[in-house]
Amino acid sequence: MSRALVTLLLLLTATAAAPAQDGATSADWPHYGGTQASWRHSSLSQINTTNVKRIAPAWMFQTGDYEGGLQITPIVLDGVMYISTSRNRVFALDAATGTQKWQYTYPLPRSFTTFYGPWNRGVAVAHGKVYMGTLDNHVVALDQNTGKEVWRINVEDANQCGC
C-alpha cells in the first residue's frame, strides 16, 4: 500500500472517530444563546444532581441600575463576564470572583426620553471589542480589555424612528 493511501486512510479514520459537535459550550458563553446556533446548553459538569441542593452564590455584583431590571444574557469569554444595564452602562467582571475590571457609561442626552423604556438587551463580544446598542440608536464599540470607547455610529435618528 502506498504511503499516501495509508496517510489518507489514517486521516479518514481519525475524522470519523471524532465526536460530533453537540452544540454545548465550554466554560465560555460567547453568544446570546451560548453558541452561534443558540443551543443554550453548557457542557460544564460542576453542578449536577448530586450537589445541586448544596450550591450557594459564589459572588454578587450590584450595578446600581434598578429601573427595568436586567434583561440581558451575560456574555462570558476568556474568564471575563460582560453585562449591560438599562441605562447604557457596560461592566466587565472577573467571572470567577465578580471583581470589576472596567465600566463604561454611554452619555445619553439629558433631554432624551424613550417610548419603550430604558431596557438594554446586552452586548456582543468579538474581534477584541465589546459592542452595545444604545437607547438613542447608536452602536458603540469598546476595547475589550480597557472598556475605552473605540468608535460609535448613529444608526437612526431617535426622534425620527417612531421609537
Annotate each language-model stretch with its function.
Residues 21-57:
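Blade/loop signatures of beta-propeller domains
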Residues 76-78, 125-127:
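Residue-level detector of Asp-centered blade-edge/turn motifs that repeat once per structural unit
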Residues 61-73, 103-124, 152-163:
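Extracytoplasmic beta-rich repeat domains
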Residues 94-97, 143-146:
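Short loop/turn segments that connect beta-strands within beta-propeller blades
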Residues 5-15:
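Bacterial N-terminal signal peptides
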